[in-house]
Amino acid sequence: MSDDHYIPTAKHGLTPEPGERLARPLQRFAKLSSSGGIVLLLMTAIAMIWANSQYAESYNEIFNETKTTIAVAHMPDHAASGHDDPATYAADPHDSEHTEDHSESAIQDATHAIQKTVADGEDGHAEDSHGGHGWKPVTDEPMWYQQHSTAMWINDLLMAIFFLVVGLEIKREVLVGELASPKRAALPIFGALGGMIGPALIFVAFNYGKETIGGWGIPMATDIAFAVGILAMLGKRIPNSLLVFLTSLAIVDDLGALVVIAVFYTENLELAYLGYAGTIVAVLMFMNVLRVRWITLYLVMGLPLWYFVYMSGVHATIAGVLLAATIPAHARVNAVNFVFSTRKALDVFANAHDDPETAVTESSERRAAVTAIMHNSRLVMPPLHRIEHALHPWAAFVIIPIFALANAGIPIHGGIVENLSDPAAIGIILGLFIGKPLGIAVLCFLACKIGIAALPKGVSWRHIIGAGILGGIGFTMAIFIANLAYANDPSHLEHAKLAILVASGISAIAGGALLLTCKSAPEPEPDSIGPLVDDDDDD
């Protein structure tokens, strides 16, 4: 049941505002299970068209050539003491008036240090962007800086937020979801193992002894947004238990991909930075043990964790998963306390002595009651759930589409057949389209045969095979691993990305077509309570 079923609508005497009416189509689209996949597909198409059009040079310039620097400058002594130090600072020859205060001078000094870094070590003092006022530091070298292309910032920093969401989903599933029960978890776990082993073996068979062998982890991945989106578009033909199975399988698959990235695609480890990262994780775990539920503190601690993981040589996105593992999963108050305190607040709200038409902001009693209800609602939701709920739309509709735009722009030089004749491309296509469904079906069959798992109610083996084919939609995670595997080999990287797109497209069409031949799923029994309002009335 959607959370939005409890939002008051016209049926409750609430007339939609003009802005709400305009936003309604977008809100309804965002509620669709397939919406994330549709946006992802659209951005992929834009990237491909852009990279192969007359504007291809601008695509490469924006994402690969443009460098962005984040820097922390040395702060001058006088910024702290309030006195200028002539041994450290030289007067600007263009400066005719020294009327700016010390705080502005400090800001200008920091700005010059950053400008100096971006200029790649250019000698001399740069002109001040505010007309040359203030003092200039003799030494412009910043205390710390990181300079990367736009694509690298997206892949290393922005995707860490996506992996935080993935980590939260994994933790939730393990604690209270399908993976919490060993019996229910067995089938998706075995399916995911088969879906990782099968593609990897096929890739190795075509690339053993070749320079492309490092890409063996590419076809192991499954894109949840695409695969689940296609299942959702098939509607009533698909039993809900199959949707749960594929989602759980993809989550276990993501966990396997994270292990592969951390273990096999990490080259030079810096143990000191790894130790710093471990210390922060230990502090976060201790905060969890102490029942600290201040979400902001966890997220702030995630920033140095990201930096230390990045500097350690392990891929920086692993920091998102580590942070997710430490987020508290238990609420501050239980359901009984929530109901009691909220009813009390509602009684205060209903029995307020003000005129019923008085605005809440003008009534101290009602304002206090609403504040109490908001506070109770926050305490009854675990921090894990609150962060996941807040970040999921950003991951689905902002981060992943931006990632697709920055990484799916593959210039096709020569014919498509020529590009796909690369052993890496062959291994990826066959691994995703053949190895995925074969591995999933075989290990699921073995798990059922030996009695440690059973098919969900309403799910047939044709459903399992169809879902396995949809598991061959690698896309996001596959492209991510390809960037790591062929980071120093642009030619093979382009071939690998093209192969991922081709294999994902074939898997989507074939899997959807097979599932369309399945009998419609039986209608679910109506909810004993049912929604308070109809979906069509949601705003």
Question: Where are each of the predicted segments found?
Answer:
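C-terminal ends of transmembrane helices
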Residues: A23-Q27, L164-A180, V228-P239, A282-R293, ...
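Hydrophobic core segments of alpha-helical transmembrane domains in multi-pass membrane transport
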Residues: V39-N52, F162-L168, G198-F203, I280-F286, ...
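Transmembrane alpha-helix boundary signature
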Residues: W50-I62, H74-A79, V165-A180, I197-G217
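Low-complexity, proline/glycine-enriched hydrophobic segments characteristic of transmembrane helices
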Residues: A56-H148, S341-A369
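Structural signature of hydrophobic alpha-helical transmembrane segments
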Residues: M152-F163, E211-A225, T266-T279, T317, ...
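Functional cores that coordinate and move charged inorganic groups
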Residues: L231-D347
